[in-house]
Amino acid sequence: MVNRQELQGHWNEVKGRLKEHWGQLTEDDLQQARGSAEQLVGVVQQKTGATQNEIEKFLDSVLNRNFTDQASETVQQYSEAAQAAAADAAAYARQNYQRLASQSGEYGAKLADTVRTRPGESLAIAFGLGIAAGAILFFGNKK
């Protein structure tokens, strides 16, 4: 059964739906029952001949539809916020990827230039790094 707060909170919608469903209801009829679910059911029952159960089911469906619409709107808002956050994250990732790719390309070019201009030093450094890596692997396996 519909309670007083639900009815008052959605009075305009309830009133409109009642007049749509039962065309013989007038504005004056509905104003007699404003705020009281029991009076509203009584007025609608008296004017239309509908059963109390039928009227209560109709009122529940009107108010439940309103609740469902509100829930749907809330879900839609959260969905839009999540999409915006995902788009921002993707843009940030793209931007940083491009920055890192250009930096790594610059480092690669600098390294190639250094190897061309100083081949002996580059070879000695590469040899030293190879010895260090081999020692780490060799002594790491003994433990």
Curated annotation (Swiss-Prot):
Short name of one Pfam family: CsbD
Family in the record: Belongs to the UPF0337 (CsbD) family.
Protein name (record): UPF0337 protein RB4474
